[in-house]
C-alpha cells in the first residue's frame, strides 16, 4: 500500500516506534517528531529520507502531512491533538486518549468544527479475530449476547502515572463497546495497589448493560504469566479467543444450557475451530486511518468511541476509589 498522503508520528518511544516501522512499510511515513535528539538521530540512520522534528509546530509549519499519529504520554495527548486538528489535519491518538472527560469531549468537538477525523488508537478493534467475533455476534451465530469476560494479565510494565486499568483496559472496553453497541448502565470496580500508593496493580471491573448483558474485565501487571483471554457467551453458543497462545485459536462452542420445562438442561455440542484472516492489527488500523484521511466518516474507533471509553475508564476509577457501583 503506497499512499501519496503522508503521516507524521509524534512520539518515537516503544509504541511510537511500532507506528513508525509499520507506516514506513506501508509507504506512508512522512515525518517523526520527538524531543530527544538522540532518538531522532537513531531514526535518521534507519530512515534517512524521512523528515525529523523536535516539535509538533515545526512539523505542522512544513504543511506536507495529511495526518498525524500521537504516541506520546497520555497527559500530553490533549494539547498535541488540538494543535494538529486546528491546523486542519486528521489525527490518530493512542490509548488512553486522555485522562479526563472534559479533554476528550473538547477533542471530539474540535474535530467536528474543523471537519477532520479524530481516531482513537484502539488497535484491538482491528484484530481479525475480534472482527470475526463481531460478525458472529451480528449474524446470530451464538444467539442473544449474554456475557463477555476478558483477562489481560502479565508480569508487565508498571506505570507510575496511571494505574493498570487505565494502562491495559482501554483495549477491552473498546471491544465491549464494539460488541454491545451500548453504554453500560452500571460499573463496579475493585482492585489492589501493592507497589505504589493509590496506583492499582490489579483490578476487576464489572459492566452491566441493557438487555441483561454483563461483562467483566480483569487486568493485572503482577501476574506470573501472560494471559490474554476473551470469552463471549450467547444464548446458543460460546466463543473463546486466546490471544496469548501460539496460533491464537478462536473457538466456537455449540453447547450451554437451555430451559426445558423451566429446568436448566445442559446442551452438548461440537467445538469448532474458527478461521480468520492472518493480518496484523496495527497494520490494519493504520491502513484504515490512511484510507479515511480523505475526511470520510470513521465507523470504527471514532470520536464517539473515544469519548465512551474514557467515560467508562473514569467511572470505573471512581468506583475503584469509592468502593461503590457507579451508574
Regions found by a protein language model. Give the residues of each.
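C-terminal helix-rich "cap/oligomerization" subdomain common to oxidoreductases
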Residues: 1, 67-72, 210, 288-327
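Contiguous beta-strand/loop segments that form the cofactor/metal-binding neighborhood of enzyme cores
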Residues: 1, 170-249, 276-297
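N-terminal Rossmann-like dinucleotide-binding module
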Residues: 1-47, 281, 290
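A short helix->loop->beta-strand "cap" motif at the edges of active sites that frequently abuts
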Residues: 29, 50, 87-89, 114-116, ...
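Short, conserved SAM-binding/catalytic segment
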Residues: 42-50, 107-111
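Short acidic low-complexity segments
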Residues: 51-63
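Beta-strand-loop-alpha-helix segment that lines the small-molecule cofactor/substrate pocket
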Residues: 62, 67, 73-74, 78-125
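Predominantly a Rossmann-like dinucleotide-binding segment in NAD(P)-dependent oxidoreductases
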Residues: 117, 124-196, 323
Amino acid at each position: 500500500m503506497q499512499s501519496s498522503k503522508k503521516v507524521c508520528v509524534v512520539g518515537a518511544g516503544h509504541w511510537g516506534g511500532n507506528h513508525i516501522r509499520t507506516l514506513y512499510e506501508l509507504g506512508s511515513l512522512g515525518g517523526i517528531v520527538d524531543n530527544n535528539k538522540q532518538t531522532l538521530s537513531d531514526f535518521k540512520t534507519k530512515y534517512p529520507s524521512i523528515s525529523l522534528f523536535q516539535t509538533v509546530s515545526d512539523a505542522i509549519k512544513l504543511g506536507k502531512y495529511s495526518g498525524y499519529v500521537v504516541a506520546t504520554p497520555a497527559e500530553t495527548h490533549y494539547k498535541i491533538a488540538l494543535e494538529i486538528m486546528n491546523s486542519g489535519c486528521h489525527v490518530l491518538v493512542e490509548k488512553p486518549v486522555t485522562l479526563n472527560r472534559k479533554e476528550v469531549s473538547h477533542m471530539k468537538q474540535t474535530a467536528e468544527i474543523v471537519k477532520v477525523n479524530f481516531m482513537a488508537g484502539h488497535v484491538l478493534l482491528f484484530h481479525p479475530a475480534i472482527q470475526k467475533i463481531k460478525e458472529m455476534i451480528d449474524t446470530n451465530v451464538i444467539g442473544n449476547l449474554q456475557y463477555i469476560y476478558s483477562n489481560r494479565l502479565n508480569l508487565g510494565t508498571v506505570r507510575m502515572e496511571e494505574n493498570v486499568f487505565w494502562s491495559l483496559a482501554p483495549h477491552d472496553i473498546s471491544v465491549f463497546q464494539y460488541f454491545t453497541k451500548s453504554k453500560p448502565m452500571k460499573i463496579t470496580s475493585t482492585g489492589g495497589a501493592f507497589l505504589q500508593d493509590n496506583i492499582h496493580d490489579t483490578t476487576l471491573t464489572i459492566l452491566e448493560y441493557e438487555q441483561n448483558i454483563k461483562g467483566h474485565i480483569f487486568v493485572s501487571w503482577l501476574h506470573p504469566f501472560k494471559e490474554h483471554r476473551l470469552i463471549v457467551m450467547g444464548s446458543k453458543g460460546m466463543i473463546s479467543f486466546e490471544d496469548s497462545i501460539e496460533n491464537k485459536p478462536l473457538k466456537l462452542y455449540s453447547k450451554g444450557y437451555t430451559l426445558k420445562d423451566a429446568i436448566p438442561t445442559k446442551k452438548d455440542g461440537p467445538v469448532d475451530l474458527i478461521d480468520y484472516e492472518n493480518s496484523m492489527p496495527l497494520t490494519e488500523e493504520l491502513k484504515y486511518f490512511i484510507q479515511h484521511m480523505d475526511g470520510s466518516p470513521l465507523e470504527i474507533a471514532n470520536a464517539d468511541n473515544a469519548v465512551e471509553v474514557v467515560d467508562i475508564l473514569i467511572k470505573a476509577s471512581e468506583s475503584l476509589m469509592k468502593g461503590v457501583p457507579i451508574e
